[in-house]
Amino acid sequence: MLAFCRSSLKSKKYFIILLALAAIAGLGTHAAWSSNGLPRIDNKTLARLAQQHPVVVLFRHAERCDRSTNQCLSDKTGITVKGTQDARELGNAFSADIPDFDLYSSNTVRTIQSATWFSAGKKLTVDKRLLQCGNEIYSAIKDLQSKAPDKNIVIFTHNHCMTYIAKNKRDAIFKPDYLDGLVMHVEKGKVYLDGEFVNH
């Protein structure tokens, strides 16, 4: 019972810290909360959270070639040239505050290309489990985190996975656009959703 209380207090303490950081971030990012009810977490706030414990950031892939009139990078199942530019820009901004992270993607051309352009040369590990968008994705995240408990993780996945996580974890309606992100962490074998990543 005592252990449970301590765990509960720790979780509450962490959530209070997160709310405070989100409020501070909100002063410079128009609002501390997104319209979907998720806390907004920008680069600087994310860097502060990463000092508390490793973070897991999930991104939707960049602009799909087969659903755009923009020029394709290569394969029709991949992303557009604009998508590569957007992914590189996001990666540069992200890496400025979180330079050390392990990089993963699902086994589709669009997520692999997005992760590759985001990372600018960082080693990419492709994991087909990251295409599974039910409770299975939590098992995959916990497994990846257990391999390097002290490392931050970036995952390129799909909109339906992120929509599922937001609804399942916080009962939030989240319809991510290209390269939108969610911030999570793993604590004592459980996966927690901290909020929506906003690139500012």
Swiss-Prot record:
Transmembrane segments: none annotated. One of its GO terms (molecular function) is phosphatase activity. Keywords: Hydrolase, Periplasm, Signal. It comes from the Bacteria. Pathway: Bacterial outer membrane biogenesis; lipopolysaccharide metabolism. Residues 1-25 form the signal peptide. CDD domains: HP (cd07040). Its EC number is 3.1.3.-. This is Lipopolysaccharide core heptose(II)-phosphate phosphatase. Catalyzes the dephosphorylation of heptose(II) of the outer membrane lipopolysaccharide core. It is found in: Periplasm. One of its GO terms (biological process) is lipopolysaccharide metabolic process. Belongs to the phosphoglycerate mutase family. Ais subfamily. Gene3D superfamilies: Phosphoglycerate mutase-like. One of its GO terms (cellular component) is periplasmic space. The gene is ais. The keyword Hydrolase applies. Its main location: periplasm. NCBIfam families: PRK15416.1 (NF011945). Disulfide bonds: none annotated.
